[in-house]
Amino acid sequence: MIPRRVVLLHGFTQGGGIWIPVMEAMTTRAPVDAPDLPGHGSASSQTTNLIDTSDELALRFGNSAWVGYSMGGRFALHVATRHPDAVSHLVLCSTTAGIEHDDERAARRAADHQLARHIRDVGVGPFISEWTSQPMFAGLKRTPLDLEVRAENTAEGLASSLETCGAGEQSPLWELLPTLRMPVLVVAGARDEKFCRIGERMAALIGSNAEFVVAEGAGHAVPFERPQAFADLVSDFLR
């Protein structure tokens, strides 16, 4: 069944415009939207949390195929678990159902808040350079589009995103994965061992309606390291 609409949800420090190469390469006949998530781009002044944002997204776009990368995947998963009637298909790329153990989640929350203070101290430009220099983004080219989209963010917006929507703020959704009934595609880059393990486990818990795919030659940022390959994966899945 062809979805009525496709919604693409970006990762931390990005914005909806980062999806342009993927959108141009997709062959689906459905209209495609790529909104800015809270704290990013045109939504830099928004400080909505994960739950409220997922409710707003479901209301805004209605029944759609949802494609989420990293942070965007956590938003997409919230939409799917809270509003399953709004999700015809679900693609989760390089993402997680949350941090399960309370002490680990508390430690991550503290680290996220410390990082938020650092962002406010150093400013958006230096922080984005630091962020994208992490080994997990080694395969990501700093294209003019990538630089332009990230430059539309603000230090306060990114800091507030961590404080309201960071992984440390999210309640784990692992126990809800078996309740998902829509077709689900879980994707991770072959060089991203951590999210390969997480993705494989997520797909196993979802069940027979889920497929786990490893993107060869890619790291964490699969859609932006290999936009054509990712677009082909998603387009084939939505047919």
Model-predicted regions and their roles:
Residues 153-204:
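Conserved serine/cysteine hydrolase catalytic core
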Residues 7-11, 188:
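The conserved beta1-alpha1 loop
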Residues 20-24, 33-67, 232:
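Active-site loop/oxyanion-hole signature of alpha/beta-hydrolase fold enzymes
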Residues 11-14, 70:
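Active-site glycine-rich loops that stabilize anionic/oxyanionic intermediates
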Residues 68-72, 76:
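Gly/Ala-rich beta-loop-alpha elbow adjacent to hydrolase catalytic centers
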Residues 13-21:
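Serine-hydrolase catalytic-loop signature spanning alpha/beta hydrolases and amidase-signature enzymes
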